[in-house]
Amino acid sequence: MITKLLTKVIGSRNDRTLRRLRKIVKEINNYEPTFEALSDEQLKAKTVEFRQRLEQGETLDQLLPEAFATVREASKRVYGMRHFDVQLIGGMVLNAGQIAEMRTGEGKTLTATLPAYLNALAGKGVHIVTVNDYLAKRDAETNRPLFEFLGMTVGINVPNMPHPAKKEAYQADILYGTNNEFGFDYLRDNMAFRNEDRVQRERFFAVVDEVDSILIDEARTPLIISGPAEDSSELYTRINALIPLLQKQDKEDSEEYRGDGHYTVDEKSKQVHLTETGQEFVEELMVKNGLMEEGDTLYSPTNISLLHHVNAALRAHVLFEKNVDYIVNEDGEVVIVDEHTGRTMPGRRWSEGLHQAVEAKEGVKIQNENQTLASITFQNYFRLYEKLSGMTGTADTEAFEFQSIYGLETVVIPTNKPMIRNDMPDVVYRTEAEKFAAIIEDIKARVEKGQPVLVGTVSIEKSELLSNALKKAKIKHNVLNAKFHEKEAEIVAEAGKPGAVTIATNMAGRGTDIVLGGSWQAKVESMANPTQEQIDEIKAEWKLVHDQVLESGGLHIIGTERHESRRIDNQLRGRSGRQGDAGSSRFYLSMEDSLLRIFTSDRMAALIQSGMEEGEAIESKMLSRSIEKAQRKVEGRNFDIRKQLLEYDDVANDQRKVVYELRDELMSVDDISDMIEHNRVDVLQGVIDEYIPPQSLEDMWDLEGLQERLKNDFDIDAPVKQWLEEDDKLYEEALREKVIDTAVEVYKAKEEVVGAQVLRNFEKSVMLQTLDTLWKEHLAAMDHLRQGIHLRGYAQKNPKQEYKRESFELFEGLLETLKSDVVMILSKVRVQQQEEVERMEAQRRAQAEEAARRAQAQHASAQSQLADDSDEGHHQPVVRDERKVGRNEPCPCGSGKKYKQCHGQIN
């Protein structure tokens, strides 16, 4: 009550922010007459002036009013477009490192030019991040004339660019690119072997377009660069043949109930589980097919990889549907469909062997499983930027998540003109067939009066179902889904014409405005060298059509189903009513829709259906509230999943930072001999401690063991026993020093033979290669640990704390192994000449380039990344067939030493 009263009196936080920014808008507007009087040359010279003032100590915030006024004036001269006051406010919000919620059609692309120009003055580069290549190229080419007029360079960062072109693009003042490509470049740079192979500069300022799509919808998708693991394609095919023999069971087994089905499906968490009967049946089938020995079980350690294949095949058949979750393209490849945008994602593959299982199910060529070489989530990549900001039409529903995870405040920017779109209440039908019949009738009525219609569907399958129904009704229409995405811009340009009907999956076409009356620019672009007279004629024709569409009611939006997220529904609605245009929207639902079926209570469903007749619809506030409640529930669960993923990934992220900082250090210096020397002393001290325990009696010393170890592991002839016999004054500390001095002398002798420079290059090469190999193995070990950590909860332990503790132990082990491996390799290697070092470097570089070419974002399903929800990890590059030997257990070789002090040092 008091809070509401205070808000009325002093305004909300958003209102107060806008009041403060409007004062600066006045300041910018005051510069307008002065800047209008400047010649083009004087206006261009402002960039040089601003850079000089920055060098003299002025801040970007102090320059902001003049810089924004400069961009506005340049835009008027280059495009004939003047930034609205609300766009200036949006630009200031972005410059402050916040999220600007701007409605569709309010000119986000032009708004981004303001903070991009201002921050580019610092000379550190500005990254403008888009969701796909088309938007990156379009926005870069659209804004290039403006930035070049002001003396700024513009670059584009898209996949498959030649290395020199990519490196040059990163030197541009303002760089447009996709989120995937920026993330992959970061990972590739941290696999590079020489400084000149890297492309990225420091990460200074990023403006993320469609920020909700990138930082929330894709937050659960790690970017992974992977290399091929062992080939097991035949096994996928053989296990795939068994899955159709399994029967679904509706209810989980319990103490009171044991069903006769083989698996159960949990639709809420999108998981599938074998029942006890199912496990026994699968084991019988495995034995019959020669995949398992008689009497063996799926859950024995040696069969873990078989269990992994069965789970993957079962999920592929039961949970993943063709034309909904993926399509099979003309080349016979399984291509993932993004559940949020409805776009295909070529090059991305599901992990955990799921992609191979789907390939086996569809009978196409099975590609090898992959092993992770480098990985990062978008959450952690974008947090590397000194300043991060974003734009979207719908961020307010996720404002809490932006604030808690990224520290980004959301500011809702007012529209330039009042919004007059009519959002009608939802209507609910009993069945999907009745719902589609009502949609067809609505479309017919609107087409007859010349009103354009955009129909949003949740999957390719539903869009094709509706398309077939429209064909039967003889209604002309366009389909915009993952199968036709290359025609996207063309279809969107036509979607605002009188009577046009467009079916789009989710947010396909997002980022491109639907202009009422169609796009006159598209018509001009299709003409060869049009005259000004022809352009004016096209504009006049368009104006007549535009007014006709406005009279018919503007663009009408039909939602065929509610999405799990209110934000996606709002995005669909937001396609209509741009720039104060007329428009309307309505969602048609049925009790068979996924959201209502899964999340509406049985009582509510029975209540609704009891009084309904065929073809009858109901509109009810209670039902709308119930649907919104279900959506909030799903959003809350998805937020918890993302938050939990981040908490686990933060552990790996801290380790990633240490490894990448070490790599940076190694690559930035030519001579690491001091580091090698320090490591040699550390490693040898540790080895000597094992055989001559500190402050121990001579009777406890194992001198023969020490001599043998020094010879085998470090190629050092140190007759320790003989030294002691010859010099009875040689005590423990002096003996240690003598062993280390001998090792140093042996290494120096090697240096004299091959030359200091050759050895320096070789040291660096060995250190980098060993670090990369160990890091790759460490990522696999971390995955392995992550997959089973939730089971610790059953032992009354906190899985997160256990994960932190054990991953820290693994990481300590990595650093120790790195030291010992490098010292052992350098001690035993015989470098002949410079050519060998160069050959090794070339080989290592070729491997890194090949891995980089194979870069792929593996789509990890949200559920498989939940620690305490599932026993499947978020990808499974390596499955161990034998039990792992503990570091402190006796070594299997029979030496009597601990594993970590014997063969564990080699492995």
Swiss-Prot record:
Membrane disposition: Peripheral membrane protein
InterPro entries attached to this UniProt entry: Helicase_ATP-bd, Helicase_C-like, P-loop_NTPase, SEC_C_motif, SecA, SecA_CS, SecA_DEAD, SecA_motor_DEAD
Cofactor(s), by name: Zn(2+)
Assembly and oligomerization: Monomer and homodimer. Part of the essential Sec protein translocation apparatus which comprises SecA, SecYEG and auxiliary proteins SecDF-YajC and YidC.
Superkingdom of this protein's organism: Bacteria
Entry GO MF terms: ATP binding; metal ion binding; protein-exporting ATPase activity
Gene Ontology biological-process annotations: intracellular protein transmembrane transport; protein import; protein targeting; protein transport by the Sec complex
Main location: membrane
Positions that bind ATP: Q87, G105, E106, G107, K108, T109, D513
Cofactor note: May bind 1 zinc ion per subunit.
Cellular compartments annotated: Cell inner membrane; Cytoplasm
EC annotation from Swiss-Prot or TrEMBL: 7.4.2.8
Region (Disordered), start-end ranges: 841-907
Keywords in alphabetical order: ATP-binding, Cell inner membrane, Cell membrane, Cytoplasm, Membrane, Metal-binding, Nucleotide-binding, Protein transport, Translocase, Translocation, Transport, Zinc
Annotated family: Belongs to the SecA family.
Name of the protein described by the UniProt record: Protein translocase subunit SecA
